[in-house]
Curated annotation (Swiss-Prot):
Subcellular location(s) of the protein: Cytoplasm
Function: The RecF protein is involved in DNA metabolism; it is required for DNA replication and normal SOS inducibility. RecF binds preferentially to single-stranded, linear DNA. It also seems to bind ATP.
Protein family (similarity comment): Belongs to the RecF family.
PROSITE patterns registered for this protein in UniProt: RECF_1, RECF_2
Protein name (database record): DNA replication and repair protein RecF
Coiled-coil spans in chain: none
Lineage: Bacteria, Pseudomonadati, Pseudomonadota, Gammaproteobacteria, Enterobacterales
Amino acid sequence: MALTRLVIRDFRNIEEADLALAPGFNFLVGANGSGKTSVLEAIYTLGHGRAFRSLQAGRVIRHDCSAFVLHGRIDDGGGRERAVGLSKDRQGDSKVRIDGSDGHKVAELAQMLPMQLITPEGFTLLNGGPKYRRAFLDWGCFHGERSFFTAWNNLRRVLKQRNAALRQVTRYAQIRPWDQELVPLAEQVSALRAAYSEAIAQDIAATCSQFLPEYALSFSFMRGWDRESDYAALLERHFERDRALTYTAQGPHKADFRIRADGTPVEDLLSRGQLKLLMCALRLAQGEYLTRHSGRQCLYLIDDFASELDAGRRRLLAERLKSTGAQVFVSAVNADQIGDMVDEKGKMFHVEQGKIAV
């Protein structure tokens, strides 16, 4: 699977760009602030419905414009080309078009364009809050199990309703109807996450052993409530506490996926360069797992490739990315930083003040 064409209009500092893309490596080279990250962000937005540097639509729409428009052509790997499009106005209203028809959902774009994002801010996967690691697990569940998205979406809805009800009820019997809906959803989502974390742990360990052979890494999934407790009984037992807090304190919305190096949390032991390498290993392992189990490739978006990595680590990452056979988009300040990746099959774009040239 590869994005063969990308059209960008009024996104960040890019007025208009029409890019024919290589199926392998695509390099975006330019000074800081030139717009190279905006190209990566446009690709990410086309596959997610939102940008990775801002959740507010108005901030990514070009100054004095009412909306941004993104179009893409996808080679699905089976000899079929798909057309996708996304527009969003300053009020946040989106329009999704797939193969010429309107009325589609952003989740359909995400299903068609699985992608892994590696940015200088991506350390949050390792040293940020549990929500970043839940998102990592949920990406894998979403692309690997079709029932996951519906269950996850319903879980979020019921949790929101239960938390609102906690502000109004006085007895547990009044909130039991929400719990009767919440419990099976919580157990379904948790079971899918647990199965995925167990399945991918071996892939992560193998990739990490190549990237960080000096450490013994271990991985553990925590579902968000006590392992020995029945969730329905726990909700009833802690009703008064939840009512005082006005939110549900335990459940799958508190799940986590922890990584330790030699028994110590990685964020307490590894250097920034090692953390970035570990983050890259996690993203690579997840993408390769998807390919092996579904036959589908994901896109890799790498912003500021050289950040935190010395020449040896850059070379190692370049070799692993090449071995995937996936489409890769890489931004760098100058061509010297990506020398280990460049070959005759790749394509280099020079970006300057929102203008993009081959």
